[in-house]
């Protein structure tokens, strides 16, 4: 990868994780809408937003090329399921007062990326990376052993998003085209659920206030912009390097949860957070040291 691609990847990764970090504030505005309904709106409006974006950027030629590779289309169905599950779990967590555990999941995620990069992409661990991963595992095990609880939400978010990033990197599909196909795979299920199954006070857009409908439509922008930045960054950076930036999003989530939404971390969560934070500190220092050494 050349220096220009790396710089682009860094900027795209920073943008993606900053937007994700403050995204819970958006979902809190529509907390009274069921999580499954919000998910359907994310899918539907993301699809139409991508159609408009593809038209403006005149990138339909990429789609024509992609259609000629059925294997990649199938793999995008896999990535669509992974990201759809991640979206649903995240929305539910934020709107059911589990924002802290959601942030924990994205603190764990960079370390999961390191493991997946080693297993599936042949990326080698350095000693300090091994130490960081072991500390993260210890944090989860201590919570399980001492407090009898397991951060299911955190682990679900961490692994679903890590595997999503891995699949997208293996496919190496242009970001916008890949996002369009992913939402296209999810669109029929989302449309059937919203228009034929969902029956809540907010499921009928014709009866909703205009402000609510605008917020629901905005789910397409809130969803696609950071995800496009992420997938574009994933094709320009090593997966382990991409993990370096992922502390930005969960840090913002943690601060939002504690400062604005009154969530208080219990002893079990703080033990796990402590292990993860130490692991991330080691990971970051190792990355900085390695970068300085290789640049000399």
Q: Which residues fall in each region the model found?
A:
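Membrane-interface interhelical linkers
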Residues: 1-15, 48-76, 127, 179, ...
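Helix-helix packing/entry segments at the starts of transmembrane helices
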Residues: 104-108, 175-185, 224-259
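Hydrophobic alpha-helical transmembrane segments of multi-pass membrane transport proteins
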Residues: 18-22, 26, 77-94, 156-163, ...
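Glycine-/small-residue-enriched transmembrane alpha-helix faces in small-molecule transporters
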Residues: 1-37, 141-170, 192, 256, ...
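Hydrophobic/aromatic residues within transmembrane alpha-helices
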Residues: 30, 38, 93-94, 119-121, ...
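C-terminal-most transmembrane helix of multi-pass membrane proteins
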Residues: 2, 247-296
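Alpha-helical transmembrane segments of compact multi-pass small-molecule transporters, enriched
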Residues: 45-49, 105-119, 189, 245-260, ...
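Hydrophobic transmembrane alpha-helices of multi-pass small-molecule transport proteins
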Residues: 128-144, 157, 268-287
């Amino acid at each position: 990868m050349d220096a220009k691609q790396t710089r682009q990847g860094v900027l795209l990764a920073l943008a993606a994780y900053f937007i994700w970090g403050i995204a819970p504030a958006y979902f809190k505005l529509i907390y009274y809408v069921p999580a499954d309904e919000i998910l359907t709106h994310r899918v539907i409006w993301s699809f139409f937003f991508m159609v408009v974006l593809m038209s403006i950027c005149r990138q339909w030629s990429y789609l024509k090329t992609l259609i000629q590779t059925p294997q990649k289309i199938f793999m995008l169905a896999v990535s669509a399921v992974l990201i759809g599950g991640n979206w649903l779990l995240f929305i539910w967590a934020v709107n059911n007062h589990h924002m802290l555990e959601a942030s924990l999941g994205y603190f764990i995620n960079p370390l999961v990326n390191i493991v997946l990069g080693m297993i599936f992409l042949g990326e080698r661990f350095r000693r300090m990376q091994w130490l960081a991963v072991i500390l993260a595992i210890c944090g989860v095990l201590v919570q399980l052993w001492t407090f009898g609880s397991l951060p299911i939400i955190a682990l679900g978010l961490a692994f679903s998003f890590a595997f999503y990033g891995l699949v997208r990197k293996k496919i190496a599909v242009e970001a916008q085209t890949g996002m369009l196909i992913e939402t296209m795979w999810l669109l029929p299920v989302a449309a059937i659920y919203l228009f034929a199954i969902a029956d809540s006070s907010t499921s009928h857009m014709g009866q909703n206030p205009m402000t609510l409908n605008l917020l629901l439509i905005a789910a397409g922008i809130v969803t696609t912009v950071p995800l496009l930045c992420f997938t574009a960054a994933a094709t320009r950076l090593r997966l382990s390097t991409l993990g370096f930036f992922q502390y930005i999003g969960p840090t913002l989530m943690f601060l939002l949860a504690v400062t604005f939404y009154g969530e208080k971390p219990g002893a079990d969560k703080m033990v796990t957070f402590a292990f993860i934070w130490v692991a991330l500190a080691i990971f970051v220092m190792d990355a900085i040291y390695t970068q300085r050494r290789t640049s000399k």
